[in-house]
Swiss-Prot record:
It comes from Mus musculus. Belongs to the Nudix hydrolase family. This is NAD(P)H pyrophosphatase NUDT13, mitochondrial. Divalent metal cations. Mg(2+) or Mn(2+). The keyword Hydrolase applies. The keyword Amino-acid biosynthesis does not apply. Keywords: Hydrolase, Magnesium, Manganese, Metal-binding, Mitochondrion, NAD, NADP, Transit peptide. SUPFAM superfamilies: Nudix.
Amino acid sequence: MSLYCRTFFRRKSFGCYRLLSTYVTKARYLFELKEDEEACRKAQKTGVFYLFHDLDPLLQASGHRYLVPRLSRAELEGLLGKFGQDSQRIEDSVLVGCSEQQEAWFALDLGLKSASSSRASLPKSEMEAELGGSFIKLRQALFQLNSVDSSLLFTAQALLRWHDGHQFCSKSGQPTQKNVAGSKRVCPSSKIIYYPQMAPVVITLVSDGARCLLARQSSFPKGLYSALAGFCDIGESVEETVHREVAEEVGLEVENIQYSASQHWPFPNSSLMIACHATVKPGHTEIQVNLKELEAAAWFSLDEVTTALRRKGSLALQPSEASPLLLPPKLAIAHHLIKKWVETRSCSSLAA
């Protein structure tokens, strides 16, 4: 009976989608592609593909912006044929989303090698010439992409990187096998199933009411300051991580921790950024910077932060000798934490 029900509802599923909201329809369609190998292979035939080479996405310059080209199945097969490869290479692709019309989106890296395949890496420069684009470091291109494209490429790169790093079973040492959608890997020997994961990271904007605390690492561009951030330790809650990280990095105790938002961040590896606001205990605002963690940390006034938010320009450009305060770009959740604090403080000032 259960087998009959599963078969019946699978046949009816596409018709039922029309009765649901667009979001629910997409979510259930993607779920089906992840669970049904046959359905996913069928979707590959009508889907589109985003190309990578050694985790660098294929991009095309358009003025000061980058466009993200995508290939149809026929175009991809034609490209592979020119480089002596057949359509089996498409099995290495991973599902990264779909359109409202249920056009499936896949990402395929033509530079990475698979432990379970003898397929070779394709020549980067020759492919760039053939495709009329360039394989560019995603972090380098970040500020020239729109938010929709950057989010999709974040997901694609993170998933491709995860598969590249989990080609062998940690228990048996044997090669693992990817399902068609790329939503998991399975070890045929140990039967262990591996799922893509993100490391939880708490990012916290600390305030004393009138000022906010920002810090920088030596690797940051000149003048750039951001909110405090750190990985969650095993066994910790989000609140415990906030308390510990602030204490470790700047020697302060915080209270009134409030969750704000979250964001997937692919650099250097996939992290789930959990954004919070917190305040220091009254009368305890003296910063003691942990130089093993940070290069500097300081309190900044509302006026200073407001001015920095209004400042235009790319972080790729070096600031002047005056080193004005630079803040994370709009794409980063730290920017939204800081902006939210400014908006809240500005409203409080007006009300007063």
